[in-house]
């Protein structure tokens, strides 16, 4: 199986909207079918302890994301969406803290609709509809933003982003010191 790697947040592919997916795109990127791509995406997401991952986060031009798989989210339900589209969302919004594999240690309070309905193709190419609520809804909306070329840092003011970035830098420095201290023992 092909190993996928996260690309840095300043890579233009992370900030570029992705064209619709077609199966003939797979071969030029060394995947034999949707199932192999889906498996590679879940493997990469799990390697970095994520709960969602979009193809452009690993440098692939596929309109596809994977989400879930964590036991505390919808009972561990995992989903892969090809060519997803939000067809409706609730009026009720929730403010929650979000993170992103593209921006390690950065957490931001983001307001999103509590519920949404996605239309998408599954790993077998069949058209599906998912009525999502709560955390799974939030994850899929976050990943859908990536497909549109938007990142979660765009949902907050520059002041809030700077404050969160400073906090992330402190956390990274704290972890480095911890690692150095434990390696010396």
Which residues does each predicted region cover?
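Positively charged
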Residues: 1-185
